[in-house]
Amino acid sequence: MTADDRIKLEPSWKEALRAEFDQPYMSELREFLRQEHAAGKEIYPPGPMIFNALNSTPLDKVKVVILGQDPYHGPGQAHGLCFSVQPGVPAPPSLVNIYKELKRDLNIDIPNHGYLQSWAEQGVLMLNTTMTVERANAASHAGKGWQFFTDRIIEVVSEHQPHLVFLLWGAHAQSKQKLIDATKHLVLTSVHPSPLSAYRGFLGCGHFSRTNKYLEQNGETPIEWRLPPL
């Protein structure tokens, strides 16, 4: 499998990740997904949306990286951006807590939807470290090869340009810290925004205002975290 026209991938990412498509793990991952589909399993997000994080945020446009774990596994939720859901789908509990922190931190009213596409289009790379999942089976595709691909994405972003902000929420995201050059970038960590942990430090972390302050200090336009209405 090579990075050719069969893979709908934004050109800067296709070039930066070209070698990954020739790696043995990618062949194994492709075969695993083929077998899952052949067995009649429903896989999320839908095929054209798997690389939405990369296609929405070209490499040269990345300012902020938010790491998630794996896609939502309910019907109609996942569309390739971590924490985000498709229009018309209620915001899941972790995203509700993200909104609560935005309200506390920047006084941004909580929106009536969970579609974070506008963040991606401003330069927020919203990357799940496992990019697919079986319906109603959380973490079912963990350890199948995506981790090698997304580790390389994190390394490429860290190497490519200085003065990015990495938001690492929870132990899984923080396990990727070793891939990031902290001398070039701002790395902000907290517990996960899940209702199980958000009260232990996510609510009150101030990550959104701190992100924008760092971007402005380094000559970048801040992120407009306020989502447009749908």
Swiss-Prot record:
PROSITE patterns: U_DNA_GLYCOSYLASE (PS00130). One of its GO terms (cellular component) is cytoplasm. Pfam families: UDG. GO terms for molecular function: uracil DNA N-glycosylase activity. The keyword GTP-binding does not apply. Signal peptide: none annotated. SUPFAM superfamilies: Uracil-DNA glycosylase-like. Keywords: Cytoplasm, DNA damage, DNA repair, Hydrolase. It catalyses: Hydrolyzes single-stranded DNA or mismatched double-stranded DNA and polynucleotides, releasing free uracil. Its EC number is 3.2.2.27. The active site is at residue 70. InterPro entries: UDG_fam1 (IPR002043), Ura-DNA_Glyclase_AS (IPR018085), Uracil-DNA_glycosylase-like (IPR005122), Uracil-DNA_glycosylase-like_sf (IPR036895). One of its GO terms (biological process) is base-excision repair, AP site formation via deaminated base removal. It is found in: Cytoplasm. Belongs to the uracil-DNA glycosylase (UDG) superfamily. UNG family. Excises uracil residues from the DNA which can arise as a result of misincorporation of dUMP residues by DNA polymerase or due to deamination of cytosine. NCBIfam families: PRK05254.1-1, PRK05254.1-2, PRK05254.1-4, PRK05254.1-5, ung. This is Uracil-DNA glycosylase. It comes from Pseudomonas fluorescens (strain ATCC BAA-477 / NRRL B-23932 / Pf-5).
